[in-house]
Amino acid sequence: MVQLVSFKTSRFDVTQETPNESNAYAGESVLRWLGDELAKHRYESTPPDMEDWGWYIDVKGAGNSYLVGASAGVEYKDEPGSALSYDVTPNVMLDWTIQVHKSRTVMQKLLGKNKLAVEDPLCVLVERI
């Protein structure tokens, strides 16, 4: 199961992000911010990294491990010979999706234990932040 949080904001300047080499999905800036916010609540996270569907961080805390992803669809600039960059103005309003996946052992999966739920502490925190 996955929990999704969607929102619209211009708070994150994706023009300062490392362009995702797999496709035109931003997410690095929102995950850097989210990782800093989670650290204030005793969660540890890795630096953001690219995935073919966007960006992700690994998060540990409250006795559990999670993969937290983020993405906002943007376009690349179409300039032959130029470096890969997003074709948006700084601080443009974008639709964001954050997804939370909870890591479970094979035994937990077989026994139906430790499932991700809406009331999971990390899900509640991500929605509150």
Predicted regions and their residues:
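Short, low-complexity intrinsically disordered segments
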Residues: L31, E51-W53, L94
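Short, intrinsically disordered low-complexity segments
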Residues: G35-V68
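Long protein-protein interaction modules used by eukaryotic assembly/scaffold proteins
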Residues: V2-E21, D58-I129
